[in-house]
Swiss-Prot record:
Function: Probable neurotoxin with unknown target. Possibly targets ion channels.
Name the record gives this protein: Conotoxin Bt14.16
Keyword Secreted applies: yes
Chief place of localization: secreted
InterPro entries the record matches: Conotoxin_a-typ (IPR009958)
GO molecular function, one term: toxin activity
Lineage: superkingdom: Eukaryota
Subcellular location: Secreted
Key word Transferase present: no
Tissue expression: Expressed by the venom duct.
Amino acid sequence: SDGRDAAVIYTESDVIARGDCKPCMHPDCRFNPGRCRPRE
């Protein structure tokens, strides 16, 4: 682990919190599509 994992997790959380995922194709959440939520 070179430290990027923490940044990725933070980015994912931030994206999900903003509800900014566009059907699991958002570049910041593509690694965890199961948690990706589309914008309403």
